[in-house]
């Protein structure tokens, strides 16, 4: 996307992502239209000829209502609009490519790294999206790129398959924006991948037990965990989360925001820090930290 374009995104996002979309992208002239993913048709309703992508988080923090991946992907593909999903919170337990997502992103700092030791992120192109089919929808990939000798990315990669997006991201965007991972961080993430499946299994098992306990606690107003939801939220969790429900949950204690702060400050065994997917048990109060600016 560039100045004058727009992205339609789920309104259920991590606070840092929402802030970037709402403010940083706005300063760049890119409009992000936030919609309620409860009804996938909201994505279609917010789309126009300048829409370049749909975006959502598989397990958004802190609502943890699973994103309707296939429903939104099916709206976008006939229009030439790729679905980009953040699967940071659900590696292994959800496979968005199986449900039509075109691109997956991860903050590798979280579950992939697994120990809170390194900062990084990855973009994964499915190779199943036809970036050439709607050239007017993806002009950056279908017109000469002056920053790379006039290359037309969809033409340049034809012998390799439909990888125009990821090749441009790797060749020019990474070059120009500078988000280069250090070799040592990459090594740490590769190590983390070796035990990722095992850790996600245990994260899910432990979280399920905690959610069950909290659901019956007198001081808890509500628990947000995929297996403990009702209606469409539970249906989507059952559809998309095939190997556990993840290691994250949200819950509300009775007494409002001040009671939440008091609870967090009283924790002794559980760490009060923001990083998820760590080797430690963590808790945070979103209203006064990660989502305080929303």
Describe the predicted segments one by one.
Residues 200, 215, 219-294:
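Conserved C-terminal alpha-helix-loop-beta "cap" of PLP-dependent enzymes
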Residues 1-216:
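Conserved PLP-enzyme active-site core in the AAT-like
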């Amino acid at each position: 996307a560039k100045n004058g374009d727009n992205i339609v995104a789920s309104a259920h996002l991590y606070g840092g992502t929402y802030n970037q979309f709402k403010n940083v992208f706005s300063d760049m002239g890119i409009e992000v239209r936030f919609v309620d993913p409860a009804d996938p048709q909201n994505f279609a309703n917010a789309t126009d000829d300048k829409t370049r992508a749909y975006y959502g988080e598989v397990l958004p923090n802190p609502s943890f209502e699973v994103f309707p991946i296939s429903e939104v992907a099916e709206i976008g593909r006939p229009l030439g609009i790729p679905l980009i999903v953040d699967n940071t919170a659900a590696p292994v337990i959800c496979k968005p490519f199986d449900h039509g997502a075109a691109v997956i992103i991860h903050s590798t700092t979280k579950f992939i790294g697994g120990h809170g030791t390194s900062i990084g992120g990855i973009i994964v192109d499915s190779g199943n999206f036809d970036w050439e089919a709607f050239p007017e929808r993806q002009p950056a990939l279908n017109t000469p790129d002056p920053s790379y000798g006039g290359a037309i990315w969809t033409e340049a990669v034809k012998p390799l398959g439909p990888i125009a997006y990821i090749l441009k991201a790797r060749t020019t965007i990474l070059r120009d924006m500078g988000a280069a991972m250090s070799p040592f961080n990459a090594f740490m993430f590769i190590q983390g991948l070796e035990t990722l499946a095992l850790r996600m299994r245990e994260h899910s098992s432990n979280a399920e037990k905690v959610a069950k306990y909290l659901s019956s606690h007198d001081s808890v107003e509500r628990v947000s965990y995929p297996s403990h939801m009702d209606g469409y939220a539970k249906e989507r969790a059952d559809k998309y989360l095939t190997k556990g429900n993840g290691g994250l949950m949200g819950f509300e204690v009775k007494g409002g925001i001040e009671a939440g702060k008091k609870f967090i400050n009283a924790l002794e065994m559980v760490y009060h820090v923001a990083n998820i997917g760590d080797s430690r048990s963590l808790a945070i109060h979103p209203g006064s930290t990660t989502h305080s600016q929303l």
